[in-house]
Amino acid sequence: MKKLICMILAMVMALSLVACGDKEEKVVSTDGSTSMQKVINALGEAFMEETGATFTYNATGSGTGIKAVKDGTCDIGLSSRYLKDEEKAEGLQETILAIDGIAIIVHTDNTVADLTIEQIASIFTGEVTNWSEVGGNDGEIVCMGREESSGTRDGFESITGTEDACVYRQELTSNGAVLTADSENPNAIGYDSQSSVKDTVKAISVGGVAPSEATIKDGSYAVQRPFVLVTKEGVALSETAQEFFNFATASAANEIISAAGVVPVN
């Protein structure tokens, strides 16, 4: 009898181990753009609440997120710029989630309220070096920007035609760092995701148009870029990652996306 009981217990334990092995943990990992932090966290929280899955976001910057997808170290990459032709040639594919404005930000005490694209380009390339040259008070302009792999920097320089020509006092690794730097220097100017801007800085108009959801949506605000989900062609997402992808790109998620300060495309 004792031997029989031991055999039954062994069988029960074996079956339990099989059952545990068959149960896949529901996890989706994302990596990339710091500009997308607000919207991706909002989507992730809603997804976890609805499904009970675990959602992770690693804020490393667009370039690193794109590389993570290519290397297979995350499920979905996050980019605040379009994929380049060479990245698409490597089998990466983009799905546009939303459109975000790139706000041109200055210190709250700065009297300049509006600049043209041409003036912005002249400032960041060092042709214009004093605020008095663009209608402001006398003071040397201090340009703050993002690091080279940043999607925000790529979008800003592409739109202003300043690729490889900007003269930065500091190249910072996150949007939050740019906000802080601009808020602490009365002569600073920088750029940041419109959805990330706080009242510690002033977002100026560009060509007479202020950045807002309405002006980004109708295209009248010129400095804007996409928020992109990056996946790898021919590589199936896990069941949970695909579930999140479908959740984030469905029209039902538009309210969440809009509440995060960006314009949904679906």
Regions found by a protein language model. Give the residues of each.
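C-terminal motif of bacterial Sec signal peptides marking the signal peptidase cleavage site
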Residues: S16-A19
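Exported/periplasmic ABC-transporter solute-binding proteins
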Residues: L4, G21-N266
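Positively charged n-region of N-terminal signal peptides that target proteins for export
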Residues: M1-L4, I8-L9
